[in-house]
Amino acid sequence: MSANLTDFVTKTIEEMNSFDRENMECIKKLIRKAIDFYHLKSYEEVEETHSGNVRFLHVHSMMEENMLSKMIVVTRNGKTDLDIEGVYEGYVVREY
């Protein structure tokens, strides 16, 4: 847990093949990597529905939600038009 958010995002994007800053699936993958890297208590759950798989983000605390939202801003080069709710299309469960 020694890297700051900007360094983590930059390094992770470099390691991912063909990362698209506008693609929500790419951003979700980055969030999953961050949850693992920083040992967060938040987690992602996949639910199978008749229209396909839906990913739910279970957020453990306000701090973790703020951190993940900040990571999205860094990922999108400072654009603040998108947050956790936008990336997960409202499928966010707050457990705090």
From Swiss-Prot:
Do you know which Pfam families this protein is assigned to?
A: DUF6407 (PF19945)
Q: Which InterPro entries match?
A: DUF6407
Query: Looking at the record's lineage, which domain of life comes first?
Result: Bacteria
Its recorded name reads Uncharacterized protein YbcH
Q: Which organism is it from?
A: Bacillus subtilis (strain 168)
Its gene is ybcH
